[in-house]
């Protein structure tokens, strides 16, 4: 296994780079503990789901740099980056992560605003008569 595994995960407009090194289980996001960065329990669990699912939380130290978007997109990007790093460390984990859909890049993006309208789909009120 390589000393440092470097992977990228994206979600909406967020981009996360994960650096996986053998260690004792510390996870830092933008040089802050994960508990401090993702204060919301759900977003934290979503971000760390690949580690808990594969039961590898105590085997690796994870350093994550994430930028762009909001916390929801960032937690999704972190999750994908960690999942990709785990598959690079151990190919046997790919099947487990694949069944939980953690290796799939979520293609949903914000729909663009169209001209002549207020928002992407919202139209002005229509009057028949």
From Swiss-Prot:
GO cellular component: cytoplasm; small ribosomal subunit
One of the protein's GO biological processes: translation
Sorted UniProt keywords: Ribonucleoprotein, Ribosomal protein
Entry annotated with the keyword Transmembrane: no
Pfam families, A to Z: Ribosomal_S9
GO molecular function: RNA binding; structural constituent of ribosome
InterPro entries: Ribosomal_Su5_D2-typ_SF, Ribosomal_uS9, Ribosomal_uS9_bac/plastid, Ribosomal_uS9_CS, Ribsml_uS5_D2-typ_fold_subgr
NCBIfam families named in the record: PRK00132.1
Family (UniProt): Belongs to the universal ribosomal protein uS9 family.
Name recorded for this polypeptide: Small ribosomal subunit protein uS9
């Amino acid at each position: 296994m390589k000393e440092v595994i470097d992977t990228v995960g994206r979600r909406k407009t967020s981009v996360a780079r994960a650096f996986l090194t053998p260690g004792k289980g510390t996870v830092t996001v933008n040089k802050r503990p994960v508990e401090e960065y993702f204060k919301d329990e759900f977003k934290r669990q979503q971000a760390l789901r690949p580690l808990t699912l594969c039961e590898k939380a105590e085997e690796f130290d994870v350093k994550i740099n994430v930028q762009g978007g909001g916390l929801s997109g960032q937690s999704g990007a972190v999750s994908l980056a960690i999942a990709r790093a785990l598959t690079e460390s151990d190919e046997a984990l790919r099947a487990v992560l694949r069944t939980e859909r953690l290796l799939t890049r979520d293609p949903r993006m914000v729909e663009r605003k169209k001209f002549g309208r207020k928002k992407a789909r919202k139209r002005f009120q229509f009057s028949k008569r």
